[in-house]
Amino acid sequence: NTDDIRNAPAIDIIQSLQQFESIHQKILPHICDLRKLIKDMTERTMICAIYLLFGKMMQTLEVIFLLAKEGRNQEVGELVRSVNENCDLISLFILNSSDEYLNKWFDGEIIEHAKAREAIHKFLNRLNLQDPVSKEELPVYEVSTYIYRVFSKYTHSSYAALLDSVDVFNKDFDFHRFAGYHYIKRNFHIIRKAIVETLLRLISLYLALSDNDNYLKVDNILKEIMPTVTEEEIKNILEKFTQKKR
């Protein structure tokens, strides 16, 4: 029964999204509370820029949840990329003490995503090298570039991404979203990752603001959704990229 093929994953998706929607509602008050730190919504400050980006991200996540319930796999992929880029832009604004990119952003310029990847790479490796056990540079830039390119396939309608929109049952484009529901369920981790990245940026902001109370509160929210990854799994993932650099 073709209806069962579509309805079964749809039910699973709706049930699984309940946790994500609950987490979203826990994050939102923290985002809204940042407004107290802003005198004017047109001020050219880091906190105002980050507040605007967080606001957009929270609304984008709401749309992602709606699209996921409808089996809109392609559109979810495009919007997850948007959340990822906004997260990295927030990191760039926090890490770049000179406000160079912040001022360009307020002037209406588009900040290249590579600039954010470079800043995050340098920061994380600076922390990593403080560990006396660490001997190699972490391939942060390479990993983030790989992820960026994967999601770019959805944005730019690459053939590889559009193959996910082929309905193998009807041998047609996936107008009835049989494939869409299947790929939403299979790729559910990308929605989780978008929420995790949002929480990590909020934690980074609280650290920059020396707001320990809110840092601890958001860290507890993060623990509810953060996937468990073993040290060995992380090592195997990083090894793929360190080998490419050699």
Label the predicted regions.
Residues 1-80, 90, 99-246:
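A cross-kingdom marker of C-terminal helix-rich interaction/assembly modules
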